[in-house]
Regions:
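Residues lining hydrophobic/aromatic ligand-binding pockets adjacent to catalytic sites
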Residues: 1-234
Length: 234
């Protein structure tokens, strides 16, 4: 059984979804520290002028360093109306926009105060749209261990997994002999974001999964699987 861990994200790009497709169990790492540089609260779409970020405004006490689970959405800003207006304007001509539109609008407009709640709804939509069968567990339900290797061992044991999908560069941060002694193997994902049809000329990589879904529809699931390769990292 393969374990993966990743912070929850707001309609993440295909490369991030590849980890969900490759793992048997995914830990939604809500206890990780929030970073504005990550895709936790934002996603990139394609407009007539190129890439545009849609960001969910957040508030939290004592950050930077605040856990994702402790952040709330700032409803003093009309972000939901803006996100939906921008999506509808730029994708209404896409072949499958209206196939997903109702569900996506409901997620965006139905957001409560909790950022994690919004991300959980977005994650459920992503997994359902791609027919992913990985079991998702919140990190809040697992042992809290500060040290990286110890946390991985505790999570692998709790989830019944014997392999772990590493992030790029993560192997150098882990105690590899300790993992080997515990019978935990390491894998890595090789994902190639092959060009697919988009609104406009050329191809922009790294956009939200919404871009892939609106343009390719149910074929997005096959696209993702066809471009994933899992190789041993140990």
């Amino acid at each position: 059984m393969i374990l993966a861990a990743a912070p929850p994200a707001y309609f993440p790009p295909p490369a991030a979804c590849a980890k969900l497709a490759a793992a048997d169990v995914v830990v939604s790492a809500e206890s990780f520290r929030f970073s504005r540089k990550e895709g936790t609260h934002r996603t990139a779409i394609r407009t007539m002028t190129g890439r545009r970020w849609l960001s969910v405004p957040v508030v939290g006490s004592g950050w930077p360093g605040t856990r994702i689970s402790d952040l709330a959405i700032d409803f003093n800003q009309p972000w939901a109306d803006e996100h939906w207006r921008v999506l509808e304007y730029n994708y209404h001509n896409a072949a499958y926009f209206y196939y997903y539109a109702e569900a996506v609008e409901r997620i965006i407009r139905g957001a409560g105060q909790s950022l994690v709640g919004l991300l959980a709804d977005a994650g459920q939509f992503v997994r359902g749209s791609l027919a992913l069968r990985a079991r998702v567990i919140s990190s809040s339900l697992l042992p809290e261990v500060a040290e990286r290797t110890g946390r991985l061992l505790a999570w692998a044991e709790a989830c019944g997994c014997d392999r772990y999908l590493i992030h790029p560069g993560e192997a150098g941060l882990l105690d590899l002999p300790r993992l080997e002694a515990a019978g935990i193997g390491l894998d890595r994902i090789e994902f190639t974001e092959a060009p697919y049809h988009q609104q406009g000329p050329g191809f922009l990589p790294g956009l939200s999964l919404l871009d892939l879904l609106f343009n390719e529809g149910p074929a997005a699931a096959g696209y993702l699987q066809a471009n994933i390769r899992i190789v041993p990292a140990d």
